[in-house]
Design a protein with these regions (language model features):
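Glycine-rich phosphate/dinucleotide-binding loop and adjoining beta-alpha-beta core of small-molecule
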Residues: 1-7, 46-53, 58-187
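Positively charged, low-complexity intrinsically disordered leader regions
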Residues: 1-48
């Protein structure tokens, strides 16, 4: 059995920064993470329907790559943003723009009441948490907290996969994920 080390969020951020400084572009890192997550997903017995919860930062960017790759693979995909699309930052914004050229519904969560949010969750077999990554600190707030609570209330009968780290675990209010896909080591 292989031993997989656990890393604190600060160490993971430092490792990511070193990779980027060594010449690996952030967009390439997102692409690698997205492909790794999709490779894992495709090995699971799922109904080919995914709702991707995406934050404004790099974890959301990973989610946009995952959405694009699943859509290219014939999946029904919907992206639910925890923020206004214009607030996506850096490489995440680049990947959201790429995704915008595909027939993938992208919905801002603030536009949904509780009934519409529940209906959206219920219409997908897999929920992918790409809200907050290792850069998050403290308890989730606002729409992010609302989405985490909704997923935890309605997770029965569907699969929940977290990208990088379950969102909100730093603040003790995290997504209850069935699976967590990480790059580099356990966090």
């Amino acid at each position: 059995m292989a031993v997989i080390p656990w890393y604190a969020n600060e160490k993971v951020r430092a490792l990511d920064a070193r990779l980027i400084e060594s010449g690996v572009p952030g967009l390439e890192l997102m692409e690698r993470v997205g492909r790794g997550v999709v490779d894992f997903i495709l090995k699971q017995p799922l109904a080919r329907s995914a709702l991707i919860l995406a934050g404004a930062g790099n974890n959301g960017g990973d989610g946009f790559v995952i959405a694009r790759l699943l859509m290219e693979g014939g999946w029904k995909v919907t992206v639910l943003l925890s923020h206004e699309a214009a607030r996506s930052q850096g490489d995440a914004a680049v990947n959201l723009t790429k995704l915008g050229k595909m027939p993938v519904p992208v919905v801002e969560s603030r536009t949904l009441d509780e009934a519409a949010l529940t209906e959206l969750l219920d219409s997908h077999d897999l929920v992918i948490d790409a809200l907050l990554g290792t850069g998050a600190a403290g308890a989730p707030r606002g729409e992010t907290a609302r989405l985490i609570a909704a997923v935890n209330r309605h997770r029965f009968g569907r699969h929940v996969l977290a990208v990088d780290i379950p969102s909100g675990t730093e603040g003790g209010e995290g997504i209850e994920a069935q699976w967590t896909c990480t790059a580099g080591g356990r966090k």
